[in-house]
Each structure stands twice: as C-alpha cells, then as structure tokens.
C-alpha cells in the first residue's frame, strides 16, 4: 500500500492522484437520474456518466457561475467548490438551474486533510466544513439534506440536497 506523508501525517497515496469523483460515483449512481450537469470534473473522462460537463478546461461559454439557461434534474460536483472564491454564490446559481425536486450532489475535501487546506495548497481558496454545507442547504430551504460528518478513505465528505 502506497502512502504519502504531509506535516507528520500519513495519507493514502490515492489522494494525490486526482479523479476524486470515482469514489463518489457508486453512491451518486444510486441517487442521480435524468438530465444533469457535472461541474468541474477537470477532464471529460472524469465526468459523471451521462452528465453534461461544465468546466473551464472545456472550450465553451459556461463555467460554475454561468450555467446553461435551462433546468436540470441534478448537479454533480466533486472537489470543485474549494477552488471557487465565492462558493455560496456558485451554489446559489446552481440552485436556479434545478428542477423542482432536483438534487445537488457534492463530494468535497474534508478539512481534516492537512494538504487540502488553502494555506498548504495554492489551488484551494476555501476549506469547507461539513456543518457549513449542511447549514447552507438547510437555510436555503432544501427539502432533504444529507451530509456526512466524517471522511472516507479519500479524506472527503458527501453533501446531498434535494429541492
């Protein structure tokens, strides 16, 4: 088993390889159906199966703050919000693109992983706490909100909310 060390803590090497979404797909496939978006997969081959890809590396007019002017059944996003200066604004915008009953499925780096904190990783501008994400969805009147408090082997957590 390969591991990496960062600031005296040992982590599984898989956390340094990218493509975190693969660990969320088995759960997401049980929940997400219909027409959807994958926001921020970084590569086409890393996108949620069947979803329309929204990413700055895709040459089109869309990004996390400028989505197609249509409604979707779900939005999947893995390890994207921590890269955005205004994650609240992004989620507010994403919510406007969901059908009634639509689902936002987030897979996010857990704050306990030292390397993913913004002061240790220049690509991350936020460290998102599970309770903050849960509070956001609850305050925005999502009907069903599920957020894991702990982390998985990829040191990530899930947040799933339905309008």
Regions found by a protein language model. Name each.
Residues 1-70, 74, 89-91, 123-126, ...:
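Conserved N-terminal segment of class I S-adenosyl-L-methionine
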Residues 14-15, 26, 30-31, 85-163:
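S-adenosyl-L-methionine-dependent methyltransferase catalytic module, highlighting the catalytic core
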Residues 74-80:
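A short beta-strand submotif of the Rossmann-like class I SAM-dependent methyltransferase core
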Residues 56-57, 78, 107-111:
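Short loop/turn segments at strand-loop or loop-helix junctions that form parts
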